[in-house]
Amino acid sequence: MQYFPIFVDTKELNCLVVGAGEVAARKVELLLKTSATITVVAPWACDTVQRLADEGQVTLHTRGYESSDLTAKQLVFVATDDSQLNIDIHHQAKAQNILVNVVDNTPLCQFITPSIVDRSPIIIAMSSGGVAPVLLRYLRQKLESVIPQKVSLLGQFSEKFRETVKARFNSVTKRRYFWEDILDGDVAEQVLQGNNSKAEQMMQDKLALDEHDSGKGEVYLVGAGPGDPDLLTFRALRLMQKADVVVYDRLVSKEILELVRRDAEKIYVGKARSLHTVPQDEINALLADLALKGNRVVRLKGGDPFIFGRGGEEIETLVEKGVSFQVVPGITAASGAASYAGIPLTHRDHAKSVVFATGHLRDNSINLNWPMLAQPEQTTVFYMGLTGLPVICEKLIQHGLPDTTEIALVQSATTTEQKVVAGNLANIQQKVAEAGIKPPALIIVGSVVSLREKLNWFGADA
């Protein structure tokens, strides 16, 4: 992050704008939305700047720039067509620790003006760091279209009751829960419809309740999907942004964690092959204890929590402890990996059934019903099977599958790090070694793998 986004109090801010053409005028008009004092210096002024000066909204000096113009200024915009003058002002301002922006010249900018969605008192500011202005305009248009203009009324309503709510609830957590319920319920709807008197009465009624928060939290068992953040469900994202605490494992990507509420506590309990960071029974107890302390806890798991995610064990403990919970399904790794590798798990000409199995190696063996797994016209998917690949291939051949049976391994499915290696039961181990495949990787066995060459749409083979 080269540019750190901040919001500056403009009540006593003195701003200098050098230049008074159309470009400078746009900066002046933007500054006029604030409480800043604005001085403009230029040999001439366009009609807009001249009108604003005549109306007394800005101070205009119709002359050339002088170094003394920087005196007592905290912010400077430079918008002239004299490149040397722009450079000189940049260096002079920087030497005096005055923030300076030379319009459309990023190397000479100590700060940049963001793209703004204004719903005062709610302000959304975005920036591309000057590298993608067209994309930024596109995103702003999207936000403008989905955020109601009347959101500003909600901001004003919240400001009116802020101190009352603060006095009513003695903890930050209880206040946040209260406001989340208000903004997600009927009170907010009344405000957006312009029914302020009704909204205020409803607000007073809610504040008068004996106890808004029971003091008992809840656990949300959330499937984070196979890796790509775009594959999260809406509900998963909504709960992630409500959480007080997030308990996550190794398969949850950094990009997905970035979507969690910024000030939520994050607890890593990740498990890797041969290394269990936190025993499962301790994780189960941790979830219950956190919720019983009044927290909203998101248990974030890669894939789907009920498919080799041990979600059932975790909620059994919650039931025993009397903790409320919700389960949010996620796209399981098998579905994500197969889709992004161009391998349909079922196909009328290849597979009439699909079986999910764990390939986890224990004591150099995998205890599975191999005759059932080694069936023709079937797709078998092995989770956590990379280390056990030699055993899987040996057992499938031993129980009747030809060594020419197609097999594929998909590493880091649905992400930019995805790799796919395809082969057959006889040669796949060598191919995997040559490609340097690492966990997390999924194994797909069956003739559907032969369709990859035709159906692949996401990336190339490793």
From Swiss-Prot:
Q: Which InterPro entries match?
A: 4pyrrol_Mease (IPR000878), 4pyrrol_Methylase_sf (IPR035996), 4pyrrole_Mease_sub1 (IPR014777), 4pyrrole_Mease_sub2 (IPR014776), CobA/CysG_C (IPR006366), NAD(P)-bd_dom_sf (IPR036291), Siro_Cobalamin_biosynth (IPR050161), Sirohaem_synt_dimer_dom_sf (IPR037115)
Name its pathway.
Cofactor biosynthesis; adenosylcobalamin biosynthesis; precorrin-2 from uroporphyrinogen III: step 1/1; Cofactor biosynthesis; adenosylcobalamin biosynthesis; sirohydrochlorin from precorrin-2: step 1/1; Porphyrin-containing compound metabolism; siroheme biosynthesis; precorrin-2 from uroporphyrinogen III: step 1/1; Porphyrin-containing compound metabolism; siroheme biosynthesis; siroheme from sirohydrochlorin: step 1/1
The Swiss-Prot or TrEMBL record describes its family as follows: In the N-terminal section; belongs to the precorrin-2 dehydrogenase / sirohydrochlorin ferrochelatase family.
Q: Which residues in this protein are found as Phosphoserine?
A: S128
Which Pfam families does the annotation name? CysG_dimeriser, NAD_binding_7, TP_methylase
Keywords linked to the UniProt accession: Cobalamin biosynthesis, Lyase, Methyltransferase, Multifunctional enzyme, NAD, Oxidoreductase, Phosphoprotein, Porphyrin biosynthesis, S-adenosyl-L-methionine, Transferase
Signal peptide (from-to) = none
The ranges of region (Uroporphyrinogen-III C-methyltransferase) come to 217-462
Sorted alphabetically, which CDD domains does this protein's record hold?
SUMT
**Which reaction equation describes what this protein catalyses?**
uroporphyrinogen III + 2 S-adenosyl-L-methionine = precorrin-2 + 2 S-adenosyl-L-homocysteine + H(+); precorrin-2 + NAD(+) = sirohydrochlorin + NADH + 2 H(+); siroheme + 2 H(+) = sirohydrochlorin + Fe(2+)
Binding of NAD(+) occurs at E22, V23, P43, W44
Which NCBIfam families does the record cross-reference, listed alphabetically? cobA_cysG_Cterm (TIGR01469), cysG_Nterm (TIGR01470), PRK06136.1 (NF004790), PRK10637.1 (NF007922)
Q: Does the keyword Ubl conjugation apply?
A: no
Q: Name one GO biological process term.
A: methylation
Q: One GO MF term, please?
A: sirohydrochlorin ferrochelatase activity
Q: What is its EC number?
A: 2.1.1.107, 1.3.1.76, 4.99.1.4
Task: Say which domain of life the source belongs to.
Answer: Bacteria
**Free-text function comment from the UniProt entry:** Then it catalyzes the NAD-dependent ring dehydrogenation of precorrin-2 to yield sirohydrochlorin. Finally, it catalyzes the ferrochelation of sirohydrochlorin to yield siroheme.
Which residues are catalytic?
D249, K271
Organism name = Pseudoalteromonas atlantica (strain T6c / ATCC BAA-1087)
Which residues does the annotated region (Precorrin-2 dehydrogenase /sirohydrochlorin ferrochelatase) include? 1-203
Protein name per Swiss-Prot or TrEMBL? Siroheme synthase
